[in-house]
Design a protein with these regions (language model features):
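Conserved alpha-helical substructure of the radical SAM core
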Residues: 1-117
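Radical SAM enzyme [4Fe-4S]-AdoMet core and its adjacent flexible, acidic
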Residues: 46, 92, 108-113, 121-275
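Flanking scaffold residues of small Cys/His-coordinated metal-binding clusters
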Residues: 20, 24, 28, 239, ...
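Exposed loop/turn and edge beta-strand positions of beta-sandwich/beta-sheet ligand-binding modules
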Residues: 19, 64, 238, 247, ...
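Conserved, mostly hydrophobic/aromatic
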Residues: 25, 29, 257, 277
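Cys/His-rich metal-chelating microdomains
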Residues: 28, 32, 36-39, 247, ...
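Flexible mid-to-C-terminal extensions adjoining Fe-S/redox cofactors in radical SAM and related proteins
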Residues: 1-4, 8, 258-259, 264-382
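Short, P/G- and charge-enriched loop/turn segments at secondary-structure junctions
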Residues: 8-12, 234-240, 290
Length: 382
């Protein structure tokens, strides 16, 4: 994070302002990625008018960075109408897309509208691997062609690569492809549960040995000895630190208007179809609970050697049944990195019972004559 963005984030935190929002315009997609955590059916997306009204409310609340994502954003026929409205409200706009539907005309229009960056999902430099993950033959070549269109318009493109068993051996090739295309490249070695709580796709996560190799690859981590060194003991400042920005300076809104702390944290805090955005942000009891949590409040993590360095995701912890609990995926990454097991992993060796799971159910309701989706009702399943 740049010094300017850090200053903005710190100021937003002090003032209680939602600096950054991810708005998913749709869960519909033209790809069917094996690791996707979304339900691609349409349960009653917000209309163009509803989204424009929401954008105005977010601007009034002080939102600066707006990330438009999905699903596939270009599946919405009103995408550019929404984008024009967002730019008129002076948001800094970032897009997440597979880019398959982008042609020269769309790339030029994105340039004219001043989009800050476009993140494009690429899983391998080899068509047979990428296309097997997306389940769409020819998708890699179409995404690469779109990236060339975007770059020809002078747009900033970031290739995003989720690492899993199917493509773990290909990340060097993806980074070389990014260099050839003149783009940045990010790698994420975490496959997350589906938003309905289904954990079957976690079998796609790379194993410990693959993570160890990744974390010792100095082209990825820099100095491997420093990156993999034992963590320092947590300090008093660490104990008082925030878990992450979710619910503090950032939040997520689904295509159905559900308001969550983060896209990976499906704790419903309200619905913008029934409440003003700012009222949910300020008054939601769920958000207030999220904001109250510090490292010292986490029974396992506050006692863990990794407390000062762990990238624990409270959303993934929530999907395991307790937002104040550990995130096993992050525990496994810390162990692969340092060779030191977390308190959570040590406890799991002594237990037979698995963690509780959380199921998120879409509850359809009729509002007037229009089907809308009320939020994700979370129920803990022992």
């Amino acid at each position: 994070m740049s010094a300017l963005m850090q200053e903005m984030s710190d100021r937003a935190l002090r003032l209680g302002v939602p600096l950054s929002v991810q708005l998913d315009l749709t869960y519909r997609c033209n790809e069917q990625c094996v690791h996707c955590y979304l339900d691609h059916d349409d349960h009653g997306e917000m209309t163009t008018a509803e989204i424009k009204h929401l954008l105005k409310e977010m601007a009034d609340a002080g939102v600066f960075i707006l990330t438009l994502s999905g699903g596939e954003i270009f599946m919405r026929k009103d995408f550019f109408e929404i984008l024009e409205c967002a730019r008129a409200l002076t948001f800094c706009i970032k897009l997440k897309t597979n880019a398959v539907l982008i042609r020269e005309a769309q790339a030029a229009r994105l340039r004219d509208l001043g989009v800050e960056s476009i993140q494009v999902s690429i899983y391998s430099h080899r068509p047979e691997v990428h296309d097997a993950i997306t389940k769409v033959p020819g998708s890699l070549l179409r995404s690469i062609k779109a990236i060339r269109f975007l770059k020809s318009q002078g747009l900033k493109v970031i290739i995003a690569n989720v690492l899993m068993t199917e493509n773990m051996q290909d990340y060097h090739g993806v980074r070389a492809l990014a260099d050839e295309l003149g783009t940045k490249c990010t790698l994420d070695p975490t496959v997350t549960p589906m938003m309905d709580g289904n954990r079957a796709i976690l079998d796609l996560n790379a194993g410990e040995s693959a993570l160890r190799r990744l974390f010792r690859d100095e082209t990825f981590v820099g100095n491997a000895d420093e990156f993999c060194a034992p963590p320092p003991a947590p300090s008093g400042d660490d104990m008082n630190s925030l878990p992450c920005s979710a619910g503090h300076t950032a939040c997520y809104v689904s295509p159905y208007g559900e308001f969550y702390p983060c896209v990976q944290f499906p704790l419903s805090c309200g619905n913008v179809r029934q409440q003003r955005f700012i009222d949910i942000w300020r008054d939601s009891k769920q958000l207030k609970e999220v904001r109250s949590i510090r490292l010292r409040d986490l029974s396992s993590c506050s006692q863990c050697a990794h407390g000062s360095t762990c990238t624990r995701c409270p959303g993934l912890a929530f999907l395991e049944g307790n937002m104040r609990g550990p995130s096993t995926a992050d525990c496994e990454k810390s162990f692969a990195r340092t060779g030191i097991p977390s308190v959570n992993l040590l406890a799991k060796k002594e237990k037979v019972s698995p963690p509780r799971l959380v199921q998120i159910q879409i509850v359809p309701t009729i509002t007037g004559s229009r089907l809308s989706s009320l939020g994700a009702a979370a129920s803990a399943v022992a």
